[in-house]
């Protein structure tokens, strides 16, 4: 019993263990199917129905062998262990580096209690245990707890025998493993984007501050006042089958369109009420230029590609924040009254859904939010993004097409018309993220789906005219344009000080905003301080002409 008390006290050092501790303290072991066997060295082996889940004779050696297969150096890592059954794996992993942490996902309270009653460990302060939690709660915790910059540190190890002791456990751990892998891929994609785009975001923010004035998106807060419904249009291939229906709905619905879906609308003489663009300057910029001609409001960020916005009337641009790069400085507080924060979350569709909710419509109607492929296409035929489908179709036999994983990933997903369609790991990951957000919004605003070829979203029903009794023309009026609360001068002064002082000291906060990749390489001693300064000075020289405009 002393072991258990000591172990619980150690686990209490981490606030994220409190739920697990409460479950352990309440649980009483009765008629256990698990048992403990001691070897000659007083090391334990866990048995299930008298069958060992780990080595009876050499659990430490087994642990070393398994961990060393997954870890080739002793740098700090975050280990995710599916089942506590072989605690020696976890303990050995933690012993390799004092800064490593372990997250244990365990379905059975019984086995966890049995182990904590019998083991001794000096590493429990660095353990988080998620005990008999719902799968969606595990994924939500992972999303919240693991920072993007830490995603490279993760190793994930499933205890094969413990996760297959019965059908229920197998289903549980298989689902957790699948969803975690998708979430890790999503965060790796985001990290890669951050490494690549951060210098561009930083430059764009400075350019937009200098040349592209606008208002806060708070100008549009609650503008629909639960009276006018909203149609959110993404660029999935399904919308090509619904052009006439979208034309009809545009008379009574506020049309909010993603930038890469905008071309589909203007090519079919449909004028949206607003366009959302958060892109770094690729195919969507052409569509934004068309939006300028059409006099359509643009919801965007200071980190977005700046050229198409130049010389637009200030009353056409409405900014929100991703809280990325220099946005963390120019906005005094991401939660302040005038600055609206919608996280990037890997895809423009996520902040667009948040904006839809922010406008407070009668209901939200989705179109083209497919998360799957229709006739080997992932995008509308009018979208410039359709080029990705061509590259991915194997009509081009080049190394380049290996970079695109939206097609031919051998994943299937069920759609509203009950047909299984091809998808990909990345699209399924985005769909799950989108579904989680949608189900939070549904508590306040109903969400429907127009396009039956789209992947099914939990609790989002297919739309029909019975859902809608919209007879009045939409009438959207802006009475008060709200200025952004931006610390422009303070930011410029801090940037100038950072550049001038870089020979003496490196402000880690600024350095990480300009180039997290180079800063990471510097911290890991993969590049010298001189090489890092050369990169920063090169970046600064490229934006000097913009800084002179302030």
Model-predicted segments: where are they?
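Acidic/Gly/His-enriched mid-domain segments of enzyme catalytic cores or analogous surface patches
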Residues: 112-197, 266-361, 515-550
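Aromatic- and Gly/Pro-rich donor/ligand-binding loops
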Residues: 174-228, 239-241
């Amino acid at each position: 019993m002393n072991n258990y008390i000591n172990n619980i006290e150690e686990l209490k050092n981490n606030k994220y263990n409190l739920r697990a501790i409460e479950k352990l303290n309440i649980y009483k072991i009765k008629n256990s199917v698990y048992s403990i066997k001691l070897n000659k060295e007083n090391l334990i082996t866990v048995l299930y129905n008298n069958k060992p889940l780990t080595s009876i004779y050499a659990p430490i050696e087994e642990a070393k062998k398994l961990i060393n297969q997954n870890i080739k150096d002793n740098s700090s890592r975050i280990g995710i262990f599916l089942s506590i059954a072989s605690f020696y794996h976890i303990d050995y992993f933690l012993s390799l580096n004092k800064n490593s942490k372990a997250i244990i996902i365990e379905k059975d309270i019984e086995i966890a209690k049995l182990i904590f009653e019998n083991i001794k460990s000096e590493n429990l302060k660095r353990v988080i245990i998620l005990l008999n939690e719902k799968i969606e709660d595990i994924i939500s915790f992972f999303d919240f707890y693991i920072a993007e910059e830490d995603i490279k540190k993760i190793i994930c190890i499933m205890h094969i025998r413990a996760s297959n002791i019965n059908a229920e456990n197998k289903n549980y751990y298989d689902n957790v493993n699948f969803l975690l892998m998708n979430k890790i891929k999503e965060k790796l994609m985001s990290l890669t984007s951050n490494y690549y785009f951060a210098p561009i975001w930083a430059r764009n923010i400075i350019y937009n501050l200098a040349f592209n004035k606008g208002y806060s998106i708070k100008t549009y807060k609650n503008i629909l006042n639960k009276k006018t419904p909203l149609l959110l249009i993404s660029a999935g291939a399904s919308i090509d089958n619904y052009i006439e229906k979208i034309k009809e709905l545009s008379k009574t619905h506020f049309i909010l369109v993603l930038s890469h879906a905008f071309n589909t609308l203007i090519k079919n003489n449909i004028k949206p009420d607003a366009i959302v663009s958060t892109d770094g300057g690729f195919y969507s910029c052409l569509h934004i230029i068309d939006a300028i001609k059409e006099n359509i409001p643009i919801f965007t960020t200071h980190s977005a590609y700046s050229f198409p916005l130049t010389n637009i009337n200030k009353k056409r641009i409405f900014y929100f924040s991703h809280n990325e790069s220099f946005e963390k400085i120019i906005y005094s507080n991401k939660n302040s009254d005038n600055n609206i924060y919608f996280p990037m979350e890997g895809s423009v569709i996520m902040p667009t859904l948040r904006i839809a909710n922010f406008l407070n419509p009668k209901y939200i109607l989705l179109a083209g939010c497919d998360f799957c492929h229709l006739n080997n296409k992932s995008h509308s035929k009018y979208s410039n993004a359709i080029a990705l489908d061509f590259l991915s179709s194997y009509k081009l036999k080049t190394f380049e097409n290996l970079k695109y994983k939206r097609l031919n990933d051998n994943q299937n997903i069920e759609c509203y018309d009950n047909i299984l369609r091809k998808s990909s790991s990345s699209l399924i990951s985005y769909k799950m993220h989108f579904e989680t957000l949608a189900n939070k919004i549904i508590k306040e605003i109903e969400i429907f789906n127009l396009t039956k070829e789209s992947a099914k979203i939990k609790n989002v029903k297919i739309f029909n005219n019975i859902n809608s009794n919209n007879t009045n023309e939409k009438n959207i009026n802006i009475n008060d344009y709200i200025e952004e609360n931006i610390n422009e001068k303070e930011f410029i002064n801090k940037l100038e000080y950072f550049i001038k002082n870089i020979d003496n000291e490196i402000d880690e906060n600024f350095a990480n905003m300009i180039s997290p990749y180079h800063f990471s390489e510097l911290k890991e001693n993969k590049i010298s301080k001189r090489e890092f300064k050369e990169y920063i000075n090169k970046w600064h020289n490229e934006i000097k002409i913009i800084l002179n405009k302030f």
